[in-house]
Design a protein with these regions (language model features):
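Residues that line or immediately flank small-molecule/substrate-binding pockets and catalytic motifs
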Residues: 112
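Conserved small/polar residues in nucleotide/adenosyl-binding loops
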Residues: 118-124
Length: 125
């Protein structure tokens, strides 16, 4: 049974969840989307492989998130959707959501705290 989200049909209604540090990266999310599902990247310490992560973790995380969203979309070959899981309770929540949307994420999944994102979703319009 296909599912339609924001006008895009997922022939395989599988939503891969965000799985934290080093698991839900571009390769996994892109592969799930390429099969017709929704692949999800996690914002949790996503820049840990960046060379300057120890000295500039905030910038490294946002740079890595941007790159991973863009690369996952390439790996998906136009199929499926790419989502980003952002924990509300983190200090980087708003910046992570903005970065993900600007990079082309199709959806944002929020958890770990009270949600206040209405003003951020206007970036997609």
């Amino acid at each position: 049974m296909a599912v339609t989200i924001r006008g895009k049909t997922l022939p395989l209604p599988i939503l891969q969840g965000g799985m934290g540090v080093g698991i839900s990266l571009d390769g996994l999310a892109g592969a799930v989307a390429a099969c017709g599902g929704m692949g999800t990247l996690s914002t949790a310490v996503c820049g840990f492989q960046e060379p300057d992560f120890a000295k500039r973790p905030f910038e490294a995380n946002l740079r890595a998130l941007d790159r991973q969203v863009r690369h996952a979309k390439v790996l998906a070959h136009g199929a499926g959707l790419i989502a980003v899981n952002a924990m509300v309770a983190t200090t980087q929540y708003a910046d992570s959501v903005r970065t993900a949307l600007r990079a082309g994420a199709d959806a944002i999944v929020c958890g770990a705290g009270p949600v206040s994102y209405t003003h951020l979703t206007l970036l997609t319009i």
